[in-house]
From Swiss-Prot:
Gene3D superfamilies: Leucine-rich Repeat Variant. Disulfide bonds: none annotated. ARM repeats lie at residues 58-95, 96-135, 137-176, 178-217, 219-258, 262-301, 303-342, 344-384, 428-467. Belongs to the beta-catenin family. Transmembrane segments: none annotated. This is Vacuolar protein 8. It holds the Pfam family Arm. The keyword Lipoprotein applies. PROSITE patterns: ARM_REPEAT (PS50176). It is a lipid-anchor. InterPro entries: ARM-like, ARM-type_fold, Armadillo, Vac8. GO terms for biological process: autophagosome assembly; establishment of organelle localization; nucleus-vacuole junction assembly; pexophagy; piecemeal microautophagy of the nucleus; protein localization to membrane raft; protein localization to phagophore assembly site; protein-containing complex localization.
Amino acid sequence: MTAIANACLSCLSAVDRWCHITACLGPIGGRSRDGIYETTLADNEREAVSDLLGYLENRAETDFFSGEPLRALSTLVYSDNVDLQRSASLTFAEITERDVREVDRDTLEPILFLLQSSDIEVQRAASAALGNLAVNAENKVLIVALGGLTPLIRQMMSPNVEVQCNAVGCITNLATHEDNKAKIARSGALGPLIRLAKSKDMRVQRNATGALLNMTHSDDNRQQLVNAGAIPVLVQLLSSPDVDVQYYCTTALSNIAVDASNRKRLAQTESRLVQSLVHLMDSSTPKVQCQAALALRNLASDEKYQLEIVRAKGLPPLLRLLQSSYLPLILSAVACIRNISIHPLNESPIIDAGFLKPLVDLLGSTDNEEIQCHAISTLRNLAASSDRNKELVLQAGAVQKCKDLVLRVPLSVQSEMTAAIAVLALSDELKPHLLNLGVFDVLIPLTNSESIEVQGNSAAALGNLSSKVGDYSIFVRDWADPNGGIHGYLKRFLASGDPTFQHIAIWTLLQLLESEDKRLIGYISKSDDIVQMVKTISDKNIESDEEDGEDGEAEVIALARRCLGLLGNGPKQTLVEG
């Protein structure tokens, strides 16, 4: 997340604050009638005050982070006079608000010293200055290396809200750097941050929840945060009226839900979580809607949550997000529905809720690879368990859309699309429809894809379509074309040496030989290359030491022998039934 740079310093304008600084320094640097300042200030302090007043007069041209201006400020910092320390801390706060850059320890050490003051005004301004400097990446690391966490943690426990706000804001900025996150988690800061997340002051609450979010980006830090008791607070704050707090808490919980152990804990202790997240999907703020859907997506990695989200009426808001024109909302919604669709009991509710057409439309309405993958994967899941749902997916135009797009989408999308066609091709009733749609025009070329997954899925789809289809005229037509046709695909897979590919090819070949289509069987019989490779496989002796491998190879050999038997070239011994 972005750093929080607006420190809770004062409601005065910048000009007013500069005037305030010079007004405070003026009487200190001058000689009063009763001589109090003259006697209480050391010579070097009086000189530093005088110099600083001059630098402030020309502040636009002055570099306060080095040389004499920094020495003058440092003299005030290490003074025993609290008024001088106040002026120094306020000056640091002002110059860092307008000039944030990488600084060295000579600048940071005086500010860290001021943090240890018992004076509230000094604490407040010093932590504001440190928070401003902590926007710079190099400064973040150096502040922690110089021991800045300890005084900041102490200030988080201050009774003063302004001090709390600045200290938490500074830690929020420090926690955006990867090098600091584990150190912050081990520093004792998590407990105070969690307590301040419940602050009645919205600025403190906002900074604290932002800091907690920054601590959720690694496994170890997430676990420490969970162990420190952050989950109930984050869940409670989902109902905050503040949009930023909602966003920070939703995103933090989304990150926490990445871990299976945390999802289990959430399921055991946070019964209102899903309902709260479903409600936030109807937020008027897109970033909150997006993170709510992503949090539900991560929760839906578990079966329990897949069902609970549907029961909590999560489908209607997800459908609205899916049909949004804002890409991040579409992506978060389609990723969520993809996980929800994994559960067989959710297939029909999702279809009945009206998701099919929007999911099909997403395939062609965006070039976003991730959205396309999630959309077609969801359609495949929805078709997995029943022929009714397979038919509805087909009627929604999924196969036609895949056929139109599959040869020009990225490999990852091709893999998902061919897998979806393979699932739909399991339905005997749909096979003629799929063939009439011309899926061979894309499946056959894709068996020669550069992607092993695309090759395998395409061949599996061809295999499923070859079984009990009734009319094999399309197989006859496409025996040699396109791209080598069915013959070329079988030849490549049989010659591949890959047991899985050989299994698919021989099983497909067996279906074609059992088709009773004389022309098709004639083509196969005349394909000496295919027949010879099947013979070679059938003559193999199993020598695998692994039982699974032995069973798989035995099945391939058995299928090869059955093919040869149907071709009239089988061995004399009894054929093994596969």
